[in-house]
Regions:
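Conserved substrate/cofactor phosphate-moiety recognition/catalytic segment
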Residues: 9, 18-65
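Phosphate-binding P-loop
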Residues: 1-3
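ATP-binding Walker
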Residues: 14
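ATP-dependent NMP and nucleoside kinases share a basic, alpha-helical "lid"
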Residues: 51-107
Length: 146
């Protein structure tokens, strides 16, 4: 069995949640990562949506949450394929998108400070040589304020 795990990596307002909602086969396959244990279930596809901005956070997610899947389900022949969905850095558009989702009532707290100030790194795939890893580069989603 192959498990395709899609990990969103991008600034607030880049389109991570929109990507998950438009690509996952069903919403039960989308898991929100807040830096706490995920308790992942065995599914053919998993979309991990969260604020993953650095290689350190990405490594912690993979080695603390995904790696245990191999041990936990050791009775089955499991192949884990990682898809890191990287939203290119465009802080200006992220600010527009954040304002848009605030106006639409999709968020109750704006992310302006995080968008402007947080460190954002390009994923270093050499850190995950034990995995079959694909990097998917995406332009950020564009909301238009009217």
């Amino acid at each position: 069995m192959t498990i395709d795990i899609y990990i969103m990596m991008g600034l607030p307002g880049s389109g991570k949640t929109t990507y998950c909602e438009t690509h996952a086969k069903n919403k039960e396959n989308i898991v929100e990562y807040l830096g706490q244990p995920l308790n992942l279930e065995l599914k053919e596809e998993i979309y991990i949506d969260g604020l993953i901005l650095t290689n350190k956070t990405l490594m912690r997610l993979i080695y603390e949450e995904i790696e245990p899947l191999k041990d936990y389900f050791s009775l089955e022949d499991i192949n884990i394929k990682l898809h890191i969905v990287y939203f290119k850095e465009n802080r200006k558009q992220c600010l527009v998108n954040d304002e848009y989702r605030m106006l639409q009532g999709k968020r109750t707290m704006n992310a302006e400070y995080s968008i402007k100030m947080m460190k954002f790194e390009y994923p270093d795939l050499s850190l995950f040589e034990d995995y079959d890893v694909e990097l998917i580069k995406k332009d950020i989603y564009n909301c238009h304020l009217t």
